[in-house]
């Protein structure tokens, strides 16, 4: 599959931070609530949210809001999407030719 330069850049940026790699690993085990991820990483929810947004933009994760029984607040859960990262010379040729 030929990727655009923009897609390649988003993927590269998403994988360029150790916290985001750790988030991918954590989400490979099960879907998680953002506060649970923040607590386990010992980071603020805001910082984890920024990392997850970058992973979501690159197509690695997806999220949804849910209302839990006995709790009227919406909770944002994240899960890993199936992915296979490859950068082929053919992609580069198509982008720059």
Report each predicted region and the residues it spans.
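Short capping segments at the starts of secondary-structure elements
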Residues: 18, 29-36
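Beta-hairpin "wing" of winged helix-turn-helix
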Residues: 58-72
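Conserved segment of winged-helix/HTH DNA-binding domains
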Residues: 69-97
């Amino acid at each position: 599959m030929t990727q655009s330069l923009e897609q390649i850049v988003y993927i590269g940026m998403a994988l360029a931070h150790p916290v985001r790699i750790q988030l991918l690993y954590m989400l490979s085990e099960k879907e998680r609530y953002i506060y649970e991820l923040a607590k386990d990483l010992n980071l603020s929810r805001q910082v984890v949210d920024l990392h997850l947004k970058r992973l979501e933009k690159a197509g690695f994760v997806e999220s949804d809001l849910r209302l839990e029984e006995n709790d009227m607040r919406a909770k944002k859960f994240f899960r890993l999407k199936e992915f296979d990262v490859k950068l082929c010379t053919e992609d580069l040729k198509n982008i720059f030719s």
